[in-house]
Amino acid sequence: MAEKEMNFEEALARLEAVVKELEDGRLPLQKALELFAEGIGLSRICNRYLEDAEQRIAILTADEKGGVVLRELGPSPAAREDTNDEL
């Protein structure tokens, strides 16, 4: 049975633990490389959750008649630039 995908909080907590282990600097090279690869994967999981949340955010604005309109908020210019950069 496939392991369920982590939620954002689980992925972020594990990513923080991986970073802490790597920053410690006492790992053998092979273990450090394995943790680095895991961290990249966790970073991508977190990024997907954040992108999904960003797409769901809606802002309320008043239309010209004073009514309330629900409008989807698109990604920020910085977020669009970041997604165009490949690692």
Swiss-Prot record:
GO terms for molecular function: exodeoxyribonuclease VII activity. Its EC number is 3.1.11.6. GO terms for cellular component: cytosol; exodeoxyribonuclease VII complex. GO terms for biological process: DNA catabolic process. It is found in: Cytoplasm. SUPFAM superfamilies: XseB-like (SSF116842). Heterooligomer composed of large and small subunits. Belongs to the XseB family. Bidirectionally degrades single-stranded DNA into large acid-insoluble oligonucleotides, which are then degraded further into small acid-soluble oligonucleotides. This is Exodeoxyribonuclease 7 small subunit. It comes from Pelotomaculum thermopropionicum (strain DSM 13744 / JCM 10971 / SI). The lineage of its organism: Bacteria, Bacillati, Bacillota, Clostridia, Eubacteriales. The gene is xseB.
